[in-house]
Amino acid sequence: MKLRLSGAASYGRVAILALAALLLSHAPRLRAEGGEPRYFAITNARIVPVSGAVLENATVVIANGLIQAVGANVAIPPEAWVIDGKGLTVYPGLIDAGDDLGMPKQEPAPVAARGRGRRGAAPVPEHISMGPEDRPGTSPWRVAADDFNPEDKRIESWREAGFTTALVLPEEGIIAGQGSLIDLSSERPSQMVVRSHAALRIGLHPTTFGFPDSLMGVISYLRQVTDDTAWYDAAAPTYAAHPNGIERPNVDRTEEIMSLILHRQEIVLFPANDIVEIPRAMRLAQEWNLHTALYGGQQGYALADQIAAKKYQVIVNLKWPEAAKDPDPENIPSLRELRFRDRAPGSPAALAKAGVKFAFSSGGIAEPRDIFKNVRKATAAGLSSDAALRAFTLDAAEILGVADRLGSIEPGKIANLVVADGDLFGEKTKVKHVFVDGRHFEIHEIAKPHKPGDSGGEKPDDATPQASDADGEVGR
């Protein structure tokens, strides 16, 4: 005879299983999806929160991708993997406020796809939408996160140097598209995006499409776009409220996005590198009442007080002007150009002195070591190390509107940290560990975290955080 549970007994077993599942669902997750630990504690370290005073012999606890606790007397969860930070300094992860990491390179289009309206115009990349005939170089609906490639080999080198977040920008255009703020953490783009619509990039270079083919034409075109957007902004809600008897306005995705811009819901990056571009950008931003950051800022040394008076923020391009590697012997640089090369690294110090908030962009620099070399040029020209660190961390986060989650070491913020053996911008400093979204990347085979409950440093193979360069000579 077969035995079977009675209905009551079956219901009882189901109830027990359901209760067990509920308890498990509320238990702490000790490992991430990839089998990596979710809890860490860095102990006995010097901690530079940026938002507050430096802490000596302190601990920072990471739980489920977030900073759980920071301080000298912090309880360490029993499930945490521990890193002895003696002799090490913990900084917030660095933010590169403007780069093309992970972005596709523009490829020449077939001859048949050459620009409109002008004989011999340059090829237009096939993946870039030129828009309708009257909207050349205009694609504000493009979002960098949609094109982001996490397999870009530069991402690892940036991360090993201490960069945990980057504002990746679309290729240039008049209204090129929206930059995205990306954490340099995983292989899945969807898990890396901090803010997909982080900043709209504006360009003032004439297009290769035939129209507009001059700076004056570009500015006139932008004025037309803003005027069209203002009309759309008024017509669309009117029609939505009372459609009967009113001609339906055309749906225009450029104007839909630009409406958000005119309502200051997103920051706009205006090209503003020299003494001509900076005043122009400030005038246009004021004319259209845009939430703006000046992008470039290398001649800020000459206009710092004016920028401060207008209360604009700046993203400084760290790719300082320099002489060509193989210059034409007949092309003798002007005194103005030589002066620019000499004084550009002094712009961050001038901006800081004037009270201008600024961030740093790698701006096309090929190697992280050159980023830090150029930061040292700025500090040699008068910028303090503290101001340089803020430009890469909290000030960058504030400019980009994410200071509630990035830029400093505080409980509740994303666990983006860099652990080094000295001054982060020192020429001989070595990065030892990097955390991005709480994920551990070990840069140097030293001070391995030990398993919860153990005093040693051994870990099972399946729990070893992803390792990077073993020699620790990174980004200097």
Predicted regions and their residues:
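C-terminal cap of metal-dependent C-N hydrolases
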Residues: A45, E398, E410-G453
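His/Asp/Glu-enriched, well-ordered alpha-helical/loop segment
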Residues: Q106, G120-P125, S129-M130, W141, ...
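Polyanionic/metal-chelating signatures
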Residues: F148-Q299, K430, V436
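Bacterial N-terminal signal peptides
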Residues: Y11-H26
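N-terminal secretory signal peptides that target proteins for export/translocation
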Residues: M1-Y11
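Disordered, low-complexity segments in secreted/periplasmic proteins that are enriched in proline
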Residues: E33-G34, V111-E126, H450-R476
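Histidine-rich, glycine-flanked metal-binding segment
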Residues: G34, R38, I47, S51-G93, ...
